[in-house]
Every structure is written in structure tokens, then in C-alpha cells.
């Protein structure tokens, strides 16, 4: 659409071209089949959304009725019990990254809006403060969309096809770009944009890390002054620090503070904890102190070489705290860790041999997990490319400066290295899976996939049974915990889920692949279940809440597994309900799967209450649960997902708006600065350069993203000339 040289009105297309999104993107002719020939040949998802409105140019009018939020849907939310979440988990997530709102190295918003109106002052809603045109009901206590009863739900409509789950609306919500999603309903589009803008506001401006930088001069606090009282330390961490605290070095104190920051995630509320009522600002202060301590060492030791400072990967204020796990593997290969010392260096001490084996297993495991998250092949050949043997089954106390190690313990004896050994035993299988799945121009035959899946599944089940069979050999001997068992199963079984997914998706049209669907349901259920113990002991595990806290606050693996496994269960359960092949034998398993979905929705709701960006997943899975509920209650083939999506979006907006008003960034800034005992008006860069005697040149700007996109986002420590650069870029 354009305006010609004569000034005539823009010409609109009378009829939009009917083509799937992939054909439109590739600018090729679409045969309008489902799926079309090009998408089927390229193994792409064929989606027809030619009715998508041009949201950037369309004028959104308020809905005609503001009271239709609840009346539009009769979906009742059951008072199903919530997950046992403790009230002391307001500190959400610990990561070694930019330490912003989510405190995670791995979280970066998938896409930031190109409108500078979103980046407003943190203490005001600005453009988001306008009253919404829909009525927002306060969130209910439960998420029982998956009603256990067989009462018919009011799901009549023409929006979502129950019998065509491949293009179901909830899958569109889950896999779309959250900043460009479309709805047929103009009201839903407006609700989505408002809620998404509020989520981005909380994610991008909730905890600007520039506020927490201070000078390395005499005003920097001592590490010992940040150590909390002993009652608090004993709850967060068990260390022999109090025997001689004055003799501890700053390096040890920084490590101690960071370890206690991790402990705040798992520490339960107790009267003896003293100051554990709200440890979030204190934990933030500890992490920022460790970050700045390391930064001061780097800067001062480098004589303030500004060239190095400008290109440092730990640039101030940005999310550039990134270290590739592939670099660790290649570094290990340069050190020769991938070659077994007994073969290539027989004269090496036994202790050093054991340490090198353990280090290689650790670095390789990090690379495998990162490759799976990034959907990339492993930087190793399929045959492994290494001959390092497995670590010996020895405890740390058995290692010493001796030429030869003692005989390793039998496999039935649990030691410090047992978990590493079990992980290492499946590494070669997982390397083959990753290279077959993600290597270019490589397709994995179905029989080969079944063989790998069977091999990995047997290994996972064998490891699970082994950990559950350990018995104390001596009084006080080490025993695997439920948490360790779950982490081991999580790190290995998630590869099985990735291997089965391509074939399970095709099982709806090819019944010869039915086994992969059942196997994926089983793997997803185990990934979302905790604890994994099959014993008859009654009562919850004493550490039963640890993994739940990681599901709520964790990023990376924990976030990805929660999303992928829940989506797989929703998709496969919907397809099984559509086929209704085994109505008698599947009734009880389907009820258990519905409970797993309810638990996942509860976790996403709690993540959102802790300002974790998960609106897209929450809305998608609530809509999926509504579709499952309609199928279980034998509704018609069509249902209207509009009331469910509208209700879920209203709950998201209510939660996010409450978070923004109650937990403003100014509040966190004041609390954290108070813990650090720092002047809030301090200019980090001027003090830093004046301390070192350097000229006050421009620091590396934390507004690199906004400069690149022509946005204005000034920060408290920006020098006047750096603000001029921002204005010029605009």
C-alpha cells in the first residue's frame, strides 16, 4: 500500500492472497492444501493465517462491552489445591549473568518492541496506565480448567476445531512471535498487546543493573560487612566460616556470598532464620558485589586499558555475560583432556588422572545440554572423538597425592563420582542423537531412531532403578537424594523427548508411528514428575520442594523442559481424545495427564507472580486445557477459545500490573543500596576513573541495543556526552 506521486489515496487489495505463512515468507506459489506441497517437502508447519490484521496500521477501537469478560464464558475454575509453594520464594532465580530482573544468564527477551513509548520511567505505568477496555477479574485460587467432572462446558463457537489439533489456536499462541501474534478478535489483539507491553516493561526496566554499580575506591563496602548473622548463614549454607572469620580472604568471602545467594532460593522460612523474611534485596546485593569485585580486579589490573574495556564481554549494563560451552570443550581438547592419560601419558599421577577424567565429563556434559537447548550438533564426531575412560567410583576422600589410586568401589556403592559415571555412560548415545537430529543434510531413519530411543530409555530406567536401590553400606554412608535422582533423569531423558518428537507429531496421520507418541507421553510425564521414587514410604520427601523451586525460578534447562514436556502432553492427549481408540483403558491415564497439566499451569502462574516472563505459555496451556476439557465432556467438534483466552489474558494483566505497582524498581534499588550502604547518587564511571587517575572518557554504553534501534533509554550513570550520542542516533 503506497501513495502515488499525484497524491491519490492508497490502494488496498480487495482480497488478500490465500497462502500459508511459509509460502508467503518464501514468496512462492502456494497450492492451498493442508499441508501444502512446499511445506510438506521442507518439513515445515503449514499455517494459514491470511486473516491476520495489520496491527501496526489498523486503528484499534475499544470493545463495545466492557463487562463481557466473565459473561462471555461459563468456564468455572475449580478450587483445586495449589502446589505447595512456600511464601519465602520471592527471590526468583539465580544466574551468573547480567543480574537484572530475572537474575539469569540465559534469559533475554525474545523480541523487544520498536516503540520507545514502552521504555518509560520504571516507577510509572505511562502508556500502560490507561484503563483497559475489558473487565479484569482477580485471579482465582485454582486453575482447574481441566474439570474432573463430565459436566458439559460452554465451549460452543466457531473459532477452534477440536478435531484439528495440528493447527489448534493454543499451538499458534505457544509457537508464535509474542510481539507479532494475531487474533481474529480485535479485542483479544488489544488485550494481548497491553499485557505483552506490561510484561516487557517489567522484563526490561525492573532492575536496571546500572543502579547498583559503585566506585572501587574507599566507598566500596567490605565483603565481611555483607555477611549476615550466623543464624541466617546456617540456614543458607553449612560452612566452617565462624571458626576464624578474620583470616578469610576476599576471594573466599565473595564465593561465600554467591553460595548463600543460591541458598536463598531453597531456604525455607523459619523463625530461627532471623533475617530470612525477605532475602531478595540482600541476595541481589551479594551477587552484585561479587560481580563488581571481579570487575574492579579486571579493570585495575589492566591499567584501565579502554580498548579492552570497550570490547570486554562483561560490558556494563548489557546482557553480554556469555560463555559458550563449546569453547570449554575445545579448551579441554587443547589441554588433552579428551585423551586418556593411561594411554597417552602412563607416568601421570593417579590423582591427576582421575581429576582430568572428571573434568572432561563435566565439560562435555555442559556442551551436550547447551547443544540440545540451541538445537545444534555437538562439536564432536558421532563416534565421540575421545577415548577418555569413565571416572573411577571413588569418593573425594579417596583422592590424594599418590601415584596410584586405590581400587574403585563396586557399582552398588554410592560415592561422590557415581552421578558423573552414570551421566558419562550415556554421553556417546546422546552425541549420536544430537548429530543425527541437528546436523545439516542429515535425516535419521525411523528404525535407527527406534534403536537409539530404546537404548537411551533402557539406560535411563536402569540408572533410575540403580539410584533407588542403594542402601547404606555403613552407618552415615552417602546416599543419593531424590533431588540428585531427578536431576540425573532430567539431564538424560530430555534427549529422548527430543528424539521422539518428530515422529510423534506425525503419528496422527501414520498409525505405524503410534509407539513414538506413547513413548513421548511417558517421557514427558516422567520429566514433569517429582519425586521419581517408587518406594512405599509415606510422607513427602524432606527436600521435595527443591526441584519445585527450580521449576518456578530456574531458567535454561528447567524452563525449556517445563514448556516442551507440557506442550507434548497437551498435543498427544488431545489427539488421543480425538481418536478415542481405547476409552476404557485410557480413562485413568488421561486423568493423571490432566493433573500434570494443571500442575504445570500452576507453576506458570507462580512464575508470572514472580515477574518471570511466561504469559505466552500460560495463555497457551490454559487454552489447551479448555480444549481437553471440551473433548473429555463430549462437546461438539468446535469450540470457542475466545472466552478462555480472554480470561487468561485478563488474569495475566492483573498479576503483572500488581507486580509492577507493588515491586517497583525504585523500591528494589533503595533496598539493595541500603544493604550495600552505598550512596544512591554515586556516579560509577567518574569515581572509577578518578580513582585510577584516568581521563573520563565514555564508558561502554549499556544502551547499545537502544542505540542500534534508534531508541532512547538513558541510564542514571550516563555522562552528558553519551546522552548526546543517544539523541543524535534518534
Curated annotation (Swiss-Prot):
Residues within the DNA-binding region(s): 20-46
Gene3D superfamilies to which the protein is assigned, alphabetical: Zn(2)-C6 fungal-type DNA-binding domain (4.10.240.10)
Matches recorded under InterPro entries: Fungal_TF_Env_Response, Zn2-C6_fun-type_DNA-bd_sf, Zn2Cys6_DnaBD
SMART domains from the UniProt entry: GAL4
Residues forming coiled coils: none
Entry keyword set: DNA-binding, Metal-binding, Nucleus, Transcription, Transcription regulation, Zinc
Main location: nucleus
Cellular component, GO annotation: nucleus
GO molecular function terms attached to this record: DNA-binding transcription activator activity, RNA polymerase II-specific; RNA polymerase II cis-regulatory region sequence-specific DNA binding; zinc ion binding
One GO term (biological process): regulation of transcription by RNA polymerase II
Compartments where located: Nucleus
Role, per record: Transcription factor involved in regulation of gene cluster that mediates the biosynthesis of aspyridones.
Listed name of the protein: Aspyridones cluster regulator apdR
UniProt source species: Emericella nidulans (strain FGSC A4 / ATCC 38163 / CBS 112.46 / NRRL 194 / M139)
Lineage, uppermost ranks: Eukaryota, Fungi, Dikarya, Ascomycota, Pezizomycotina
Amino acid at each position: 500500500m503506497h501513495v502515488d506521486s499525484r497524491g491519490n489515496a492508497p490502494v488496498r487489495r480487495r482480497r488478500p492472497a490465500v497462502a500459508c505463512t511459509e509460502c508467503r515468507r518464501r514468496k512462492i506459489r502456494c497450492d492451498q492444501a493442508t499441508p501444502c506441497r512446499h511445506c510438506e517437502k521442507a518439513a515445515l508447519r503449514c499455517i494459514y493465517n491470511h486473516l491476520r490484521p495489520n496491527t501496526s496500521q489498523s486503528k484499534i477501537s475499544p470493545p463495545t462491552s466492557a463487562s463481557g469478560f466473565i459473561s462471555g464464558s461459563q468456564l468455572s475454575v475449580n478450587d483445586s489445591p495449589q502446589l505447595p509453594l512456600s511464601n519465602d520464594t520471592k527471590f526468583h532465580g539465580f544466574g551468573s549473568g547480567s543480574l537484572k530482573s530475572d537474575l539469569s544468564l540465559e534469559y533475554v527477551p525474545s523480541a523487544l518492541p520498536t516503540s520507545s513509548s514502552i521504555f518509560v520511567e520504571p516507577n510509572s505505568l505511562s502508556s500502560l496506565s490507561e484503563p483497559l477496555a475489558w473487565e479484569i477479574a482477580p485471579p482465582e485460587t485454582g486453575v482447574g480448567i481441566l474439570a474432573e467432572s463430565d459436566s458439559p462446558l460452554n465451549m460452543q463457537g466457531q473459532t477452534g476445531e477440536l478435531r484439528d489439533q495440528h493447527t489448534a489456536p493454543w499451538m499458534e499462541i505457544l509457537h508464535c512471535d509474542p510481539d507479532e501474534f494475531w487474533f481474529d478478535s480485535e479485542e483479544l489483539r488489544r488485550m494481548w498487546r497491553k499485557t505483552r507491553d506490561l510484561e516487557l516493561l517489567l522484563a526490561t526496566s525492573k532492575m536496571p543493573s546500572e543502579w547498583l554499580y559503585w566506585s572501587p575506591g574507599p566507598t566500596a563496602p567490605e565483603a565481611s560487612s555483607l555477611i549476615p548473622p550466623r543464624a541466617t548463614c546456617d540456614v543458607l549454607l553449612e560452612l566452617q566460616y565462624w571458626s576464624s572469620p578474620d583470616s578469610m580472604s576476599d576471594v573466599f568471602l565473595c564465593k561465600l556470598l554467591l553460595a548463600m545467594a543460591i541458598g536463598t532460593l531453597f531456604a525455607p522460612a523459619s523463625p530461627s532464620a532471623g533475617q530470612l523474611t525477605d532475602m531478595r534485596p540482600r541476595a541481589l546485593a551479594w551477587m552484585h558485589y561479587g560481580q563488581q569485585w571481579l570487575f574492579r580486579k579486571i579493570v585495575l589490573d589492566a591499567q584501565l586499558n579502554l580498548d579492552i574495556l570497550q570490547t570486554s564481554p562483561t560490558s556494563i549494563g548489557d546482557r553480554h555475560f556469555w560463555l559458550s560451552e563449546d569453547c570449554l570443550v575445545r579448551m579441554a581438547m587443547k589441554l588433552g583432556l579428551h585423551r586418556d592419560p593411561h594411554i597417552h601419558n602412563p607416568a601421570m599421577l593417579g590423582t591427576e588422572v582421575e581429576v582430568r577424567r572428571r573434568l572432561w565429563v563435566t565439560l562435555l556434559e555442559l556442551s551436550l545440554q547447551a547443544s540440545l537447548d540451541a538445537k545444534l550438533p555437538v562439536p564432536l564426531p558421532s563416534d565421540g572423538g575421545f577415548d577418555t575412560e569413565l571416572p573411577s567410583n571413588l569418593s573425594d576422600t579417596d583422592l590424594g597425592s599418590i601415584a596410584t589410586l586405590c581400587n574403585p568401589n563396586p557399582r552398588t556403592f554410592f560415592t561422590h563420582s557415581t552421578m558423573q559415571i552414570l551421566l558419562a555412560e550415556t554421553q556417546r548415545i546422546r552425541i549420536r542423537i544430537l548429530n543425527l537430529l541437528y546436523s545439516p543434510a542429515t535425516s535419521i531413519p525411523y528404525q535407527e531412531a527406534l534403536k537409539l530411543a530404546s537404548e537411551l530409555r533402557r539406560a535411563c530406567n536402569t540408572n533410575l532403578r540403580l539410584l533407588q536401590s542403594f542402601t547404606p553400606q555403613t552407618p552415615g554412608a552417602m546416599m543419593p537424594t531424590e533431588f540428585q535422582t531427578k536431576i540425573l533423569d532430567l539431564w538424560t531423558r530430555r534427549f529422548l523427548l527430543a528424539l521422539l518428537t518428530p515422529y510423534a507429531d506425525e503419528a496422527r496421520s501414520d498409525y505405524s508411528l503410534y509407539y513414538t507418541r506413547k513413548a513421548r507421553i511417558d517421557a514427558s510425564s516422567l520429566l514433569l514428575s517429582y519425586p521419581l521414587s517408587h518406594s512405599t514410604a509415606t510422607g513427602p520427601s524432606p527436600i521435595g520442594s527443591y526441584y519445585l523451586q527450580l521449576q518456578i525460578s530456574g531458567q535454561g534447562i528447567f524452563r525449556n523442559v517445563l514448556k516442551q514436556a507440557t506442550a507434548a502432553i497437551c498435543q498427544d492427549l488431545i489427539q488421543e481424545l480425538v481418536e478415542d481408540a481405547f476409552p476404557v483403558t485410557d480413562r485413568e491415564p488421561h486423568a493423571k495427564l490432566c493433573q500434570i497439566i494443571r500442575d504445570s499451569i500452576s507453576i506458570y502462574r507462580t512464575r508470572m507472580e514472580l515477574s518471570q516472563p511466561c504469559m505466552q505459555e500460560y495463555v497457551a496451556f490454559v487454552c489447551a486445557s479448555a480444549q481437553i476439557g471440551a473433548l473429555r465432556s463430549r462437546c461438539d467438534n468446535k469450540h470457542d477459545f475466545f472466552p478462555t483466552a480472554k480470561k487468561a489474558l485478563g488474569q495475566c494483566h492483573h498479576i503483572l500490573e500488581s507486580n509492577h505497582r507493588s515491586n517497583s524498581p525504585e523500591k528494589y534499588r533503595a533496598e539493595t543500596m541500603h544493604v550495600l550502604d552505598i550512596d544512591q547518587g554515586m556516579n560509577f564511571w567518574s569515581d572509577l576513573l578518578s580513582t585510577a587517575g584516568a581521563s573520563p572518557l565514555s564508558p561502554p554504553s549499556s544502551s547499545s541495543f537502544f542505540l542500534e534501534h534508534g531508541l532512547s533509554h538513558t541510564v542514571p550513570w550516563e555522562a552528558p556526552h553519551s546522552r548526546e550520542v543517544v539523541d543524535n542516533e534518534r
